[in-house]
Amino acid sequence: MLISLDFGITITDILRKKDDGTLIHQMLPTNQKPSEQFIQELFKDLDLKEEVDRIALTGGHHQLIGEEIDETPVIHVNEVDAIGEGGLAVSKLDASKPAIIVSSGTGTACILAKDGVFTHCSGTGVGGGTVLGLSKLLLNTVDPQEIQDLANKGLAKGTD
């Protein structure tokens, strides 16, 4: 099994890739700095040493974690590279052509992908954190899954 965590300012994204290729995605509000103990608690249902091949980390403060947890290798990924590689993979864009990858988290980052190099070229502080704040005020929830479920029921025609 492979595990990846993105420690965002507002949300921590967790992705498990099982040996059969099944992906399990989970989002949690970020309420503490990353630590080995926090990761062990997240995966208390697993024997990290026996069941997990490696753990990949990115996002804020990922560097607080060492190079292994319970003898499982930890890979640290620069967030700009993670956004660039992930954006190209998800979009299926031709990596030989320049592209701008946009990631909306607590803020919004614009990453230039060109010649195999990823560069932060622009961004704004408005992003997912703004959505969470508005959701708390208007919907009385900050649960990302509940917000997503409500958004899926909405009609985009009514937006500007």
Residue map of PLM features:
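Short glycine-aspartate micro-motif
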Residues: 2-6, 52-56, 98-103, 123
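Short glycine-rich, Thr/Ser-proximal phosphate-binding strand/loop in the N-terminal lobe
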Residues: 2-37, 41, 118
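A short acidic Gly-Thr/Ser loop motif
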Residues: 6-11, 60, 102-107, 125-128
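Short beta-strand-to-turn element immediately C-terminal to the catalytic PLP-Schiff-base lysine
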Residues: 17, 111-114, 137
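Short beta-strand-loop/turn "lid" adjacent to the catalytic site in phosphate-handling enzymes
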Residues: 24-30, 45-79, 113-120
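Helical "lid/coupling" subdomains associated with nucleotide-phosphate turnover
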Residues: 30-40, 65-66, 83-88, 98, ...
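Conserved phosphate-binding catalytic cores of ATP/NTP-utilizing and phosphoryl-transfer enzymes
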Residues: 75-102, 107-116
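Glycine-rich phosphate-binding loop plus the immediately following alpha-helix
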Residues: 117-160
